[in-house]
Amino acid sequence: MLNDTTSKDYEYEYDQEQYSDLLNVPVDCPAGNCFSNDAYLIVLLGLYSVIFLVGVPGNTLLAWVTWKESRHRLGASWFLHLTMADLLCCVSLPFLAVPIAQKGHWPYGTAGCWLLSSITVLSMYASVLLLTGLSGDLFLLAFRPSWKNADQRTCGVRVVQVSSWMLALLLTVPGAVYRKLLQEHYPPRLVCGTNYGGSVTAEVTITTVRFLFGFLVPLVFMASCHGILQRQMARRHWPLGTAVVVGFFICWTPFHLLRVIIAVASSHSPLLAWALEAEPLVTGLALAHSALNPIMFLYFGRKQLCKSLQAACHWALRDLQDEEESAVTKVSTSQEMVSEMPV
C-alpha cells in the first residue's frame, strides 16, 4: 500500500507502518492476475477523490452540528472528536494523491514524508481510542448508577477524550521515527517509505503494537460493551453508537489482518505476493472510513433529510441520546424490580 523499502528481500515494495501513502503496484505477478499500473492509478485517484469530496464537507458539517450539540449533550462531544480525527485524514488525501499521480515520486521532502504519514496514523489511533471511550461511556451509563451524575461524567469523559488524543500521538511516534525518504533507481525517484535498517525487532514490535492497540484490544472491549448493551436495550435496533463502531471495524479489519500477513510472510512466498496485490483495495477500504460517519448520520437522520442536512444530523444525535436513556432506563427498571422482591 505504501511505499517502503524494508529488510525483506523481495521484488515488491511495501510499507510496514503507514496506511495512506502511495500504494506500490506489483512489478511482477506470480499469480498472473495483476491489474495494469494505469488501472491501479485510476482506481486509487478516483477513490481518494470520492473520499475527499464526501469526507471534507460531510465532516465539516458534522463538526459544526456536534459542536453545537455538545454544549447541551455530553454524548455529542464523542462525535465531535471523532469527526476531527476523520477530517485530519480527509484533508491529507489531496497531498497523498500527488505522489500517486506521479507514479511514486515524493515531492514534499523529508518533513512532508514524516508529517503526512504521522497525520494519517494519528487519525487511525485517535478514532479507535475515542470509539473505545464512547463504548465505555455508554456501558457505565447502563451499569454504574453514579456515572449518571452530571459533574462526574463530564469530568470523566473530558479526561478520556484528551487522553485518547495524547495516547494516539504517543503511539504514532515509533513508526514515524522510521519514516525516510528513499532513493529508488528503477525507475529513478524519491519515495516516502519505512526503513527499519534491517532491525527485525523494530519491525515486529511496531506491527504488534499497531495490531494490539489499533485493533485487537479495542475490538474485544467494544464488542463486549455493545454486546451486553444490546441485550439490555429496551428497544431492539442498531443504535448510532453501535453502528459507528461496527462501521469502523468493517473498514479496518482487512487492513490490520493484511499488515500482519505482510509482516510475517516469508520473502518470495505466494502469500506475500497475494497480500501485496490485495493491499491497494484493502487500504482504500480503510481510508474510506474517514468519510463513513457523515453518511451514517444522514441515514439515522433520514426522517429529517427533506428539511436540511443539518436537521438530519441533529435528528441522528437524538438516537444517541435515546440509546443512553434506554440503557439507563432498562437497568434502573431491573434494579427496582430486584429491590421490590420479598426477602
From Swiss-Prot:
SUPFAM superfamilies: Family A G protein-coupled receptor-like (SSF81321)
Transmembrane among keywords: yes
Pfam families named in the record: 7tm_1
GO molecular function, one term: complement component C5a receptor activity
Topological domains, Cytoplasmic: 68-78, 144-155, 232-243, 301-343
Entry keyword set: Cell membrane, Disulfide bond, G-protein coupled receptor, Glycoprotein, Membrane, Phosphoprotein, Receptor, Transducer, Transmembrane, Transmembrane helix
Bilayer-spanning residue ranges: 45-67, 79-101, 121-143, 156-178, 209-231, 244-266, 281-300
Stretches in topological domain Extracellular: 1-44, 102-120, 179-208, 267-280
S-S bridge residues: C113-C192
Known partners and oligomeric status: Interacts with C3 (the anaphylatoxin peptide C3a and the adipogenic hormone ASP); the interaction occurs with higher affinity for ASP, enhancing the phosphorylation and activation of GPR77, recruitment of ARRB2 to the cell surface and endocytosis of GRP77.
PANTHER family xrefs: C5A ANAPHYLATOXIN CHEMOTACTIC RECEPTOR 2, CHEMOTACTIC RECEPTOR
Family (UniProt): Belongs to the G-protein coupled receptor 1 family.
Name of this chain's protein: C5a anaphylatoxin chemotactic receptor 2
Taxonomic source organism: Rattus norvegicus
Gene: C5ar2
